[in-house]
């Protein structure tokens, strides 16, 4: 088993995990199943395969069963048994403190993370599972607090494992609980003039998450003292939005009061946290931009009034500032903008929603927008990235059942109506439409027929309606080849009408090898008619060797008399 790349640290952790595995018979059946799923996620050999993908759905199901509304309470029910077994009483209590902190921190993650908050536990699962593995690794080392902070117990150990000792979530919880050892350590890190305890991003993330004012004040002084240290300034600005609102507000006030937005690193950090102006931030993050952020964060009523603004930057930052405190508050404001707002307002709203990483909310809002704005292709260009986002026509994995209608539409009739809306858009545009500038002078948007057909394909997939699949066959040639191959291999496997059979047969001669391969797999499981075999014979005149092999394999499945006829025709 490999839990971490660092070999020395891995050897330190494994005995603890092995002991947990050996003693799991003490667990009740349900907790034992959860434990097995977590271990598969923990083990790097299984984390990125089918087994590793089971943890999040398991937790999501528990959230649904227990009606958990706040991430702070995620491990209060049946998950608490797993937590206690994995970590023991002390670390489990500390993890509960971490969850209370997490409820006030952004849920977004990855390169496109933004300062958006919600207590919805399903939105925090990436962060929570990462933190749980971090707590378990630290618990498994058996290190005391000082050894964890130092990255080892001896100079030799520190040299080999310190860089692999992530502990920012643990530190944040310790700060929140008033742990003097951790607080004093971070004070020394922030004020030290030597490299004994080198400041890193994990330290800054822990301080931001905890919101502990004395440490924030030291961080603010460090920000002011950075002088020519652009890297230090950027690290502070890019981590100050990973914590509670108070951390961001305090450090942002230092930036504003001292005009630090003149530095390129500060501009980049602000652009990342808001989601606009990331490219060429030095030109786009102006004093007006910074003033709007400060004003809206401190005057939420003015932010709501600004939703009627004709200035797209002001409108965007007003939406961002509302989501900064609670993304769900945006949902109540949306219907009026969609129904009564100008086109630029709706486009700006949809553009902003991409930064929320809130798939369920974004689909609901984009669905409402399509009802009203399906006759405006430029608006549809902003709708589609949010619409049914999360579905993927992958040929790999167990996707045969397809997405559930109830997760995306109220009724079958609504889904069919949206299918027709998409057809209308398809017929009203060329193969690719470009809208430039779009919302902001530096932005462009694109809408392709392939994008539209993909969403139509998702609807036919979830409806299991043969007539609708027949209708889509006329539009499938426009679909990007990889997705078209996925549609053939999943939705048209097997075909449920003669028209679908003919489309799959035609795809056997497609230019794309992916499409040809999937068509061959589908046809291999069918009994072809004499007329269909004649069409297969036609493919032998093409030069693609693998196409000819597939055609011959299909023809060889014929009864002897029909096979003899094929041979005579081909000789």
State where each predicted segment sits:
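Structural detector for internal amphipathic alpha-helices that build alpha-solenoid repeat scaffolds
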Residues: 112-119, 166-177, 188, 201-210, ...
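Short inter-helical turns and helix N-cap capping residues of alpha-solenoid HEAT/ARM repeat scaffolds
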Residues: 194-196, 229, 282, 310-312, ...
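Structural detector for tandem alpha-solenoid helical repeats, activating at a conserved register
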Residues: 313, 467, 482-483, 499, ...
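Long amphipathic alpha-helical coiled-coil/heptad-repeat bundle
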Residues: 83, 99, 103-105, 109-211, ...
């Amino acid at each position: 088993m490999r839990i971490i790349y660092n070999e020395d640290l891995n050897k330190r952790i494994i005995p603890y995990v092995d002991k947990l595995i050996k003693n799991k018979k003490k667990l009740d059946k349900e907790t034992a199943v959860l434990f097995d799923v977590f271990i598969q996620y923990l083990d790097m050999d299984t984390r990125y395969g089918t087994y590793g993908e089971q943890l999040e759905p398991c937790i999501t199901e528990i959230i649904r069963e227990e009606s958990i509304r706040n991430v702070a309470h995620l491990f209060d029910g049946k998950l608490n048994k797993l937590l206690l077994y994995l970590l023991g009483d002390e670390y489990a209590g500390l993890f509960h403190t971490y969850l209370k902190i997490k409820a006030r921190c952004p849920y977004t993650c990855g390169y496109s993370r933004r300062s958006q908050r919600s207590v919805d536990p399903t939105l925090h699962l990436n962060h929570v599972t990462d933190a749980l593995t971090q707590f378990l690794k630290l618990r498994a080392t058996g290190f005391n607090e000082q050894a964890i902070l130092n990255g080892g117990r001896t100079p030799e150990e520190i040299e080999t494992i310190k860089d692999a000792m992530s502990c920012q979530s643990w530190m944040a919880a310790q700060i929140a609980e008033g742990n003097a050892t951790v607080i004093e350590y971070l004070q020394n890190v922030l004020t030290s003039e030597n490299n004994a305890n080198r400041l890193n991003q994990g330290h800054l993330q822990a301080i931001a998450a905890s919101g502990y004012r004395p440490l924030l004040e030291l961080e603010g002084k460090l920000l002011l003292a950075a002088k020519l240290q652009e890297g230090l300034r950027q690290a502070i600005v890019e981590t100050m939005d990973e914590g509670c609102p108070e951390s961001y507000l305090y450090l942002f006030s230092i930036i504003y009061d001292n005009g630090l937005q003149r530095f390129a690193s500060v501009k980049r950090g602000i652009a990342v946290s808001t989601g606009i102006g990331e490219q060429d931030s030095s030109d786009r993050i102006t004093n007006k931009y910074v003033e709007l952020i400060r004003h809206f964060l401190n005057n939420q009523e003015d932010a709501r009034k600004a939703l009627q603004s004709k200035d797209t930057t002001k409108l965007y930052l007003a939406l961002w500032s509302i989501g900064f405190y609670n993304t769900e508050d945006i949902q109540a404001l949306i219907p009026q903008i969609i129904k009564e707002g100008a086109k630029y307002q709706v486009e700006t709203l949809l553009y902003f929603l991409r930064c929320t990483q809130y798939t369920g909310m974004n689909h609901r809002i984009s669905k409402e927008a399509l009802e009203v704005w399906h006759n405006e292709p430029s608006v549809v260009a902003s709708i589609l990235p949010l619409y049914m986002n999360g579905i993927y026509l992958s040929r790999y994995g167990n996707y045969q059942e397809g997405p559930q209608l109830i997760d995306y539409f109220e009724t079958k009739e609504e889904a069919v109506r949206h299918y027709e809306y998409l057809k209308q858009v398809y017929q009203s545009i060329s193969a690719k439409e470009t809208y430039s500038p779009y919302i902001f002078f530096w932005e462009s948007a694109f809408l392709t027929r392939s994008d539209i057909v993909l969403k139509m394909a998702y609807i036919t997939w979830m409806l299991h309606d043969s007539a609708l699949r027949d209708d889509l066959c006329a539009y499938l040639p426009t679909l990007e080849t990889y997705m078209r191959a996925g549609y053939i291999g999943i939705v048209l496997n097997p075909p449920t009408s003669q028209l679908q059979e003919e489309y799959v047969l035609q795809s056997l001669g497609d230019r794309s090898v992916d499409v040809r391969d999937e068509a061959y797999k589908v046809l291999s499981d069918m009994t072809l008619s004499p007329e269909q075999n004649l069409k297969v014979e036609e493919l032998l005149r093409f030069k693609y060797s693998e196409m000819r092999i597939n055609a011959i394999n299909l023809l060889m499945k014929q009864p002897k008399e029909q096979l003899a006829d094929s041979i005579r025709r081909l000789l």
